[in-house]
């Protein structure tokens, strides 16, 4: 099929926050996205697979200060330094087509234009923010949304925040977002829909604080330099700026947007299924076709997170068990929409049972038969049968993959 004739398929991971090295949970999401991208290429699609890093925010600024370096130096080391994120994805054979960093000049330029446009159309206005803020999650919360006085997402401490800020009229789009979630398959799996509607939309969406003045590491609001753009506004639009929206770096926006699916962890479904479509509605832009909120990898029933320090290093696992074995384990073991209990014991058990025993025995028996019947050498000339022709046809065409769909694959 000619390149211009191919259907397009645009798939993304979330862009990861480089406050520390990534853990096996991030690898899980990226490997799953990679598997889907490879699968769609087998079907003959023109695939755009995007991943990257979300590099602004108060947490990065605080981490850099504690390390005695600039924020840019801090994220450069995590992203592009030895055994950084770029090295990890290379090690794990991730086939992404692009990698975006929110500190890239073209992205910063685009975000300033986007923020200004929403301001000029009346959906961003100036006010004063008073409420709770979770620095690890870079999230604003009302008192009623807290869980036992702590962040409902990560369980961490929140602090009072009071500062001049710009706000996005999120409340204006509550009805349209609710309709999107409840009448379409935009958000998957369906279990996530009730959570978003019951916990966030129906209690009443408040306008979203979209700028900060209490720190400086972010995209400056070009018409009010004392403000930097809220990190989630900066981050979410990466899916469009990486295609050239409002910049001249790339020219693929009309070709690939809207995205076919965003794969994201369930802890950021709220941003992708409520805030993201609302801002796109404000901009008059098409919405992504699907957001898929996958589950967490947990250890002994507890969530794995950088802030808790209870993470598993994918480099260690890949070096010990091999990249292909680790990829197989992540894709084989955990239902994608549900949480999964990770343990070294389960990893070893899966490798032994599925690879060493089943696949290993097949290879062992095949090589033994080659040795016994052909003297250890396969004949260079052989007679093909009808069964051989059928097998060749099956493995050389993507048609056999077309019965699989996103829900069955995930």
Ranges and model annotations:
Residues 132-136, 295-297, 346, 382-386:
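A glycine-rich phosphate-binding loop feature that marks nucleotide/adenosyl-phosphate handling sites
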Residues 402-410:
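Conserved small/polar residues in nucleotide/adenosyl-binding loops
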Residues 83-89, 115, 119, 206, ...:
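Structural signal for well-ordered, non-membrane alpha-helices
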Residues 95-101, 343-346, 378-384:
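Short linear capping/connector segments at secondary-structure termini
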Residues 54, 374-400:
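Acidic, turn-prone loop/beta-hairpin segments
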Residues 2-51, 106-110, 160-372, 379:
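Structured secondary-structure scaffolds
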């Amino acid at each position: 099929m000619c390149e211009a004739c191919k259907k397009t398929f645009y798939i993304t991971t979330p862009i990861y926050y480089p406050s520390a090295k990534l853990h096996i949970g991030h690898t899980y999401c990226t490997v799953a996205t990679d598997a889907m991208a490879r699968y769609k290429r087998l079907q003959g699609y023109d695939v755009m697979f995007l991943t990257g890093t979300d590099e602004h925010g108060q947490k990065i600024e605080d981490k850099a200060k504690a390390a005695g370096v600039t924020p840019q130096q801090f994220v450069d080391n995590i992203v592009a330094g030895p055994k950084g994120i770029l090295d990890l994805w290379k090690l794990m054979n991730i086939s992404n087509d692009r990698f975006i960093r929110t500190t890239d000049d073209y992205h910063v330029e685009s975000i300033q234009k986007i923020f200004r446009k929403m301001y000029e159309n009346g959906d961003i206005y100036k006010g004063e923010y008073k409420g709770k803020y979770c620095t690890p999650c870079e999230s604003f919360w009302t008192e009623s949304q807290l869980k036992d006085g702590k962040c409902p997402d990560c369980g961490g401490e929140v602090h009072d925040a009071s500062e001049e800020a710009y706000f996005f009229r999120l409340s204006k789009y509550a009805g349209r977002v609710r309709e999107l979630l409840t009448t379409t398959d935009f958000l998957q799996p369906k279990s996530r829909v009730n959570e978003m509607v019951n916990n966030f939309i129906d209690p009443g969406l408040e306008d979203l604080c979209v700028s900060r003045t209490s720190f400086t590491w972010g995209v400056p609001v070009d018409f009010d330099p004392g403000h930097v753009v809220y990190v989630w506004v900066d981050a979410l639009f990466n899916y469009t700026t990486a295609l050239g929206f409002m910049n001249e770096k790339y020219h693929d926006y009309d070709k690939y947007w809207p995205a076919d699916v965003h794969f994201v962890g369930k802890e950021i479904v709220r941003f992708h299924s409520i805030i993201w479509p609302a801002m796109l509605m404000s901009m008059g832009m098409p919405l992504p076709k699907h957001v898929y909120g996958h589950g967490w990898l947990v250890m002994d029933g507890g969530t794995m997170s950088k802030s808790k320090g209870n993470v598993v290093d994918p480099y260690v696992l890949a070096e010990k068990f091999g990249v292909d074995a680790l990829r197989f384990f992540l894709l084989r073991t955990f239902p994608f929409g549900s949480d999964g209990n990770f343990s070294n014991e389960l990893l070893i058990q899966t490798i032994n049972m599925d690879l060493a025993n089943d696949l290993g025995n097949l290879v062992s028996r095949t090589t033994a038969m080659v040795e016994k019947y052909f003297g250890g050498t396969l004949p260079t000339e052989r007679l093909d049968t009808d069964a051989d022709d059928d097998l060749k046809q099956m493995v050389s065409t993507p048609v056999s993959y077309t019965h699989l769909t996103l829900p069955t694959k995930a």
